[in-house]
């Protein structure tokens, strides 16, 4: 939303007309044929905001002819969905930074791309490396 203001749209127009904002990224799925369990490094998990105690084992693709030895086959989306609440509207009108808006939205329950990616890692759909490659660190 701050991008619209940066492009010259008046804040009152953005605040009154935008209902929600969606961000998505496509991440590669682990190949089901060559999928194997492994014990991840604690640091790589904590960098993504995943408690290492909750993920004693994860999955990765070993590579096979079915996935052309990449370890991945197919894609899925990770999402971030911001509902424009009255508080967010006030922040837009006050020209608050996108970092501040995002931080407050997370405190109110919004899930970031990284959080959704972490769920997909724990479900064995994708890898730590893939989510790290496609998302920014939640630095707020």
Where are these regions (language model features)?
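Short, flexible helix-loop junctions that flank or precede catalytic/ligand sites
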Residues: 1-140
